């Protein structure tokens, strides 16, 4: 699976559906995250919880054995195409900059996307069904 910022923020913020996201992560042995999404997640978490939140993020990623995938040209191209098709102001999915990197990694890896919200369900990307 590819983990989007929205899912990881839900888990680290202990939102009501956090356990469902955690169960989905535990059920899949492939756990990928774009380094662009990692930065986006760190910015959100540290804005909410300060540097201790950032340390908790890094610890969570380590314990969950999430593979941070560097942004290369193929991921960037897929992200760019996602914005062209599904970007905010262009399509009802309304993908933002960070969303496009999650989409791009899911597209090039062939892995389903774990996310919170309704944006990605309006795209052609495979998604993770929550337990």
Swiss-Prot record:
GO terms for biological process: negative regulation of growth. Pfam families: PIN. Its EC number is 3.1.-.-. Mg(2+) binds at residues 4, 99. Its cofactor is Mg(2+). Residues 1-129 form the PINc domain. GO terms for molecular function: magnesium ion binding; RNA nuclease activity. CDD domains: PIN_MtVapC28-VapC30-like (cd09871). Keywords: Hydrolase, Magnesium, Metal-binding, Nuclease, Toxin-antitoxin system. It is an enzyme of class 3 (hydrolase). PANTHER family: RIBONUCLEASE VAPC2. Toxic component of a type II toxin-antitoxin (TA) system. An RNase. Upon expression in M.smegmatis inhibits colony formation. Its toxic effect is neutralized by coexpression with cognate antitoxin VapB30. Belongs to the PINc/VapC protein family. This is Ribonuclease VapC30. It comes from Mycobacterium tuberculosis (strain ATCC 25618 / H37Rv). The gene is vapC30.
């Amino acid at each position: 699976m590819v983990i989007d910022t929205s899912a990881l923020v839900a888990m680290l913020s202990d939102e009501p559906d956090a356990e469902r996201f955690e169960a989905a992560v535990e059920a899949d042995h492939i756990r990928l995250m774009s380094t662009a999404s990692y930065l986006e997640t760190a910015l959100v978490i540290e804005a909410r919880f300060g540097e201790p939140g950032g340390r908790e993020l890094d610890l969570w990623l380590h314990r969950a054995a999430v593979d941070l995938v560097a942004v290369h040209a193929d991921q960037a191209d897929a992200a760019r195409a996602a914005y062209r098709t599904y970007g905010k102001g262009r399509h009802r999915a309304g993908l933002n900059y960070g969303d496009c990197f999650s989409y791009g990694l899911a597209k090039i890896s062939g892995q389903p996307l774990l996310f919170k919200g309704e944006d990605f369900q309006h795209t052609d990307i495979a998604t993770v069904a929550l337990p």
